[in-house]
């Protein structure tokens, strides 16, 4: 049998319980259902680290007529006021709180008297429960920490609820924000297998740590995660007693790759125009990245598109929870973002092409529907990814370029048997900083469809382009650089963090003498902080060599 045909059959078999529709473009057929049921929610029941700006969505097996009286959203201060709008002919109800939810708080959503000709819709456990994240930078410590003690809040995958795999990355959420300079792979943080340190990429931001092994782990041999007490929070406090967790990686082979298209909302129209394709979950334009902030206004949005190469684990070995991954280096590219001063006055330039790069393998799972045991209920999809967000125009990159860790998409997957395609719809929230002064937010309505003809589907492009220095700070404004300001190198694409080595591939001198410095990677940038900080009347030089590479291994064009 042709391998590409086998891929389609394998992918369809994974979702065979999901059914396929012949009516609406991306809905499951519920014609044989005996009663109306909830089939999806965002956030999912039990989800943590939810953005306070997130919508709350409930999706039903049938169209329903609802208003705010049919839902109760309860938080730490009692009932939350919100508005409701429908999507997909009434199959989805989107609740928008009148103001942002409280940080680090528990919320519960219940349904009230949603009656249809097919019965009353209900949530099996009575409510959808979720927790919001702690506050981000610029807020008091009490709001930025989940608890008064510094420790590990969660590890994913945990090996229980979600299986740990031979291609798993490890995502940790801490209770308090980290001092990133104390989180050093191979020193204060390690993964070991068979007594050897596993080569891995480490990414740190806020309360999040991502550990992405460079190579596949060996199945059948335990992997141990260790954090020493050398890991510190922003306030200089150590991780008392450290932290240890052991995993047993499961074999996901043989795998198949399913090529999916993330098509634009419209080939010609913009995301904010009438008539573009919308998400059945939210009713918003698909594959658009909106950014809402006081500095930007609420009309800043980029239309994204690209191909996603989803690698599926061997389904017979994972009948209930099927793992998948999207390889690092995957790209989504999009239209320019408008740059406005105060969200209103045009700045006279746009961002140029917007690129979203997968910094590591995005890990995900297709899970049994948590709300319905009907064989036609769609599978739940969870996908976690670390991405770099950058723009073509460097003047705009100062506002938008950054790394976003552990972005979580929650959706569902169905099999359209008439098209011969697997269809994914998902929702997530991104919260990038704008100019380092404000946290913007955007609700992503992600949509992908596998190519029906996998034999002739696109192949993943090989990156053979070397990263170049696109801009740097202070650049031509050296006389405006203040003591204590960082030196920032902006490259044309994200870099491999393991190749940026202080005193080797990256050097800083002051009046010709080497100086110590701290640094971190953010998006396509290296942010350098000399130790001691920049001094008046001192000539500094920064040099990087071709030992620095992009995430595909292409060497940089060295420069001083």
Residue ranges and their predicted role:
Residues 15-17:
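C-terminal motif of bacterial Sec signal peptides marking the signal peptidase cleavage site
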Residues 19-72, 106-108, 112, 119-188, ...:
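N-terminal non-catalytic regions of secreted/periplasmic and cell-surface proteins
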Residues 60, 105-114, 174, 221-227, ...:
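Short beta-strand segments enriched for Tyr within beta-sheet-rich domains
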Residues 89-95, 205-211, 522-528:
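Aromatic sugar-binding surface patches on proteins
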Residues 99-105, 215-221, 532-538:
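Surface-exposed, short loops/turns at beta-strand junctions within beta-sandwich domains
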Residues 116-127, 233-244, 396-400, 435-443, ...:
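Beta-sandwich strand segments
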Residues 182, 251-468, 477-479:
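Extracytosolic secretory-pathway proteins
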